[in-house]
């Protein structure tokens, strides 16, 4: 394994991955804040943790080093001055309603041991947890019935989205929604102050502070020359253009392929409808088999992004991009339309490839799993009755840091 960030494919043997073990943040979910916190349901924490632990153990059993958001963020904040700076930035990004509240929350959190503090900001800070303080703020009075000073971050177990390791660099994302934007701040501090992310030649392709939204579920590293990006509900054209300019101008990658996908929650990211499982095999949702519009981005001689539009079938596109004589598309749910919709909702297309032809999937997507098995793909199925309630699969729940080259 090469040191540091090294990720030039979707299918090379996975050596190291960043996860977040689902925690008390999901206990902050109630029906009235579903829209605010981007959930449709409430996972049962005890079972969700068991399922997530089973996921991590499958990875370890297959030679993957598993590291966690809480631990890696705590390493980055070991210096008390950096910890204090982070807290001030995090609290500001949380939009507390008054200076008095912000100061009280800062002192409450800053006194905690660092690892405990990181876990606490993820799970959320309730108003009744912070020592009382005097405030004559009208905004504070009006919002007094809302239970949190700092909202929980229940989406963080989908570690794919806040950032992506691409080649020998990191893309730290400006998330589409304010609810999730703070997640990438943790990754920003990892990059700046944790040597496992900041050391050596690790570069930065996009940053938390950039203005336009992009999320990691829309980024697929097809090979050492080509990165695919979804133009989706969560990723904008302006962000893709800036990302492409930075990546293509400072790396070995030669092109960015942009897939224009439906702007709906069911097709939230590119990896919910399309993932790579082997050199020439892909899981897909049937609705993207029809001719697609995509854009190919490259740099011109002046270092500016030029793009061309292509309309073709996914099969032809992948054959051309990957220089393959043929590719095989494995439909989520097979030819059964109801199974396809059901298993798409439960992320049947969202597989995590940990080696060529070996994938981690949810066991509940049995139709798709059987099809993968028949096509010669080794399926490592994990329980997902509770963790799937967040609308993300094994790929969503993982941020690969290091893979073997293929």
Regions found by a protein language model. Name each.
Residues 1-406:
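The feature marks the mature, well-folded catalytic cores of soluble enzymes
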